Amino acid sequence: MKWLKQLQSLHTKLVIVYVLLIIIGMQIIGLYFTNSLEKELTNNFMKNIKQYATQLEVNIERIYRDDPSNAQKEVQSLLNEYANRQEIEEIRFIDKDQIIMATAKISSHNMINQKVNDNSVQKALSLGESNSHNVLKDYGSGKERIWIYNLPVKNGNETIGNIYIESNINDVYNQLNNINQIFIIGTAISLFITVILGFFIARTITRPITDMRNQTVEMSKGNYTQRVKIYGNDEIGELALAFNNLSKRVQEAQANTESEKRRLDSVITHMSDGIIATDRRGRVRIVNDMAIKMLGMSKEDLIGYYMLSVLNLEDEFSLDEIQENNDSFLLDINEDEGIIARVNFSTIVQETGFVTGYIAVLHDVTEQQQVERERREFVANVSHELRTPLTSMNSYIEALEEGVWKDDNLAPSFLSVTREETERMIRLVNDLLQLSKMDNESEQITKEIVDFNMFINKIINRHEMAAKDTTFVREIPSETIFTEIDPDKMTQVFDNVITNAMKYSRGEKRVEFHVKQNALYNRMTIRIKDNGIGIPINKVDKIFDRFYRVDKARTRKMGGTGLGLAISKEIVEAHNGRIWANSVEGQGTSIFITLPCEVIDDGDWDEE
């Protein structure tokens, strides 16, 4: 196992990395050198063969031009002269009919005047272009690499034959192998020297690191007296010097570590809430950003001050009571912002029982309290809205039971009031059910792409025909605007807004409709303005709250439930839109609705 540990040491790893870098470098150089050398040698070989073939081509062309009757004999003599090169195995002249007219190889003389079926020869004759390829052939001494070259011979524009040359390229590769062997031997010698040098070089790096490792082991045992030997002024020497300084400082700081560790652990545990940490006297020493935000104070106003005074608890609790009482309680810690927090206190105690500080954890429950308050208000509003018509109905029914039904004048009036109150309760219950579905996201929204101009004009026309005493003014763009909405749900929204506009208008009633499109953001804004009594500026933002009425008596008299605009807001937001209001008291109210939209040309809208 000792050799395995030595193999895993930094010293060995540095040597291995050093050797691997050398090997990789030599491999890259060798690969490039071998490929370049092979390419150069083969190109030179082929260039020489092509030069011989070109000389043959010129001579054969001259023979066929000067003495065609005696051409075969003269070509044979010519090939015999060119066949004395060592690398050339065979030279043939093949006429345009693929008949062997002459050959330089004696063993192939029996093939003269015979037709040869060779694809490369046929290709050279048919295309009139030279070609070449490599093959392996056995000439009796084993398989050898042969380079075959075909060069067409032309007399003017007519191809009269083809020169076929087989050349032995094996010598080129033998020469290349010899060079590679020399390169490999040189690489091996270099690696041997590199390994030896690598061990000595790596030792100069690992020796100080080994010393620091040994010192670290001693420090883990609590021994801070030893120092690391500094071997030089390089980076490792500076590291050794810094390590010695660190050892000294750790020794000095060890006494304070336990107390700080416990305090920081407590702070980290509760970082999602507001954290206030103090010393043993209750003076604030650490406070996080959340606590600063919740208290609405700066860090300078908190650090060093008494924690109970900061939380306005100085008259109610003492540090001893906090230490004994672990109960949490609600505290209004920021009256300006209306922030309510649940406060938990904990005490930091050492193992000896000595108290070193206190921790206050502030958990923001403002939203929870708001939800609970809204729930109570909602229940109270529903109870009130149901109790009023029920009380009225009960009174009329009691009167009818006592004999009013016999009165032909009063009975119909009492029954009419009872029916109206019943219908109002039905509307209220239906609105509550719709809001409940929207809160639970179970309300079905069935969107479809509609022509908004046609959609809004249809709604306005319906109200215009029903309300003869109201003037409707339209400013709607002429270009077609398409939007994806649920027509029924959005009709409910516009009916709600238009009905309110007509209901609260006065004098010469006037309702204006403005539609403006922002093509850059694919949004459109619909503005519906009345000339009614308006809404006080401090109540404008509340009109979309459930059961909120600016004038409760007038709204109830007109049959409203106080839920119409709340439902409208939920529907618009379900369409990725927004609804809000602007109003000047005594000058009317404007309701704004924004929705996604597209301006689509007729050609883009045609279905395939």
From Swiss-Prot:
Give the modified residues of type Phosphohistidine. Answer: H384
| Domain Histidine kinase intervals | 381-599
SUPFAM superfamilies in the record: ATPase domain of HSP90 chaperone/DNA topoisomerase II/histidine kinase, HAMP domain-like, Homodimeric domain of signal transducing histidine kinase, PYP-like sensor domain (PAS domain), Sensory domain-like
Q: Looking at the keywords, is Ribonucleoprotein present?
A: no
Report the CDD domains cross-referenced here. Answer: HAMP (cd06225), HATPase (cd00075), HisKA (cd00082), PAS (cd00130)
Tell me the membrane topology, using the record's own terms.
Multi-pass membrane protein
Biological-process GO terms, alphabetical: osmosensory signaling via phosphorelay pathway; regulation of DNA-templated transcription
Modification(s) after translation: Autophosphorylated.
Domain PAS intervals = 260-330
The chemistry this enzyme catalyses reads: ATP + protein L-histidine = ADP + protein N-phospho-L-histidine
Concerning InterPro entries, the annotation shows: HAMP_dom (IPR003660), HATPase_C_sf (IPR036890), His_kinase_dom (IPR005467), HisK_dim/P_dom (IPR003661), HisK_dim/P_sf (IPR036097), Light-responsive_reg (IPR052545), PAS (IPR000014), PAS-assoc_C (IPR000700)
Q: Name one GO molecular function term.
A: ATP binding
- Name any GO cellular component annotation: plasma membrane
Transmembrane annotation, as ranges = 14-34, 182-202
Superkingdom: Bacteria
Alphabetized UniProt keyword annotations: ATP-binding, Cell membrane, Kinase, Membrane, Nucleotide-binding, Phosphoprotein, Transferase, Transmembrane, Transmembrane helix, Two-component regulatory system
| Residue ranges annotated for the HAMP domain, each copy included | 203-255
| Location within or outside the cell | Cell membrane
**Sequence ranges assigned to domain PAC in this UniProt record:** 324-377
- Specify whether Membrane is a keyword of the entry: yes
Q: EC? A: 2.7.13.3
Q: What does this protein do?
A: Member of the two-component regulatory system WalK/WalR. WalK functions as a sensor protein kinase which is autophosphorylated at a histidine residue and transfers its phosphate group to WalR.
Q: What is this protein called?
A: Sensor protein kinase WalK
